[in-house]
Amino acid sequence: MNEEDLNRLNASGDLNGANNQRIPAGPSGVNQPIPSVTAGGQNQFRPSGGLGNQGSRPTESSNQDELLPTEAEIEAITSDVESNSVAPKATIREILDTLQAKRQNATPKDLFSLAWACYHNGSSRFVNLNTDAPCGITHADLKTLWKASATLRQFCSYYAKSCYVSGKQQKKPPANWSRKGYPEEAKFAGFDFFNAVLSESSPAPPGGMRFKPTQAEILGHSMNAKMSIVESRQSSHMVSTRADLLGRQQINEQPKPPMITF
């Protein structure tokens, strides 16, 4: 078909010409491309629409590393958060069972009373506690019931949020905050297991987290913790610490002026 025949066909409006018929669907049921005639008499095929025979994309499962768990397994494992600085709930339950074996009237408030005493006096294993739990046992005896399962600080860290919120709510900062060098705006962070307040492993108190740690409290506790580490090293490694201080002094010492000769 030449250009003159094509123009005549378009002018007549005949849409049933041989070159305008749709090719029947193929075996797959997908309409075949429709041929269109150009001015030069050449056939050009245009797609009939739809996705047609596009190649199927590979599924994500085919690309999954065989050494990785499934998505459901990852969600199951990461649903619980445990930190080795905070005693897990199972350990706290064992401690309560041990206490109740000695004191039948013991309740969870006795365990919290020990954490509250350490809130004011420290949770070091060397701390001296002269107070008593509500059930009648002394805190000094209570803190020795579970030496093998958790440290005193790990135990107290479980109650860190409860101690922090109670202290702020009752306006009772740790008793030794000033002696430890905390500023006024950070005094409620002046207990040595404050960092557990920011841990997901420490449960929130029954009334929820009514108070959140401020930036000043977080910074104040961080600086105090670093100073405690320095003091601990000074007391146990006096020789090496003194050498470090001398080395720093030599580094910071101003250089001697050059000698001028004539």
From Swiss-Prot:
A GO CC annotation given for this chain: helical viral capsid
Keywords recorded for this protein, A-Z: Capsid protein, Helical capsid protein, Ribonucleoprotein, Virion
What domain of life does the native source organism fall in? Viruses
Q: Name the residues that span the membrane.
A: none
Q: Where in the cell is it found?
A: Virion
Question: Compositional bias (Polar residues) spans?
Answer: 29-46, 54-65
Signal sequence range? none
Q: Which GO terms describe its molecular function?
A: structural molecule activity
Q: What family is reported?
A: Belongs to the potexvirus capsid protein family.
Q: What does this protein do?
A: Required for genome encapsidation. Forms ribonucleoprotein complexes along with TGB1 helicase and viral RNA.
What name does this protein carry? Answer: Capsid protein
Species source reads: Shallot virus X
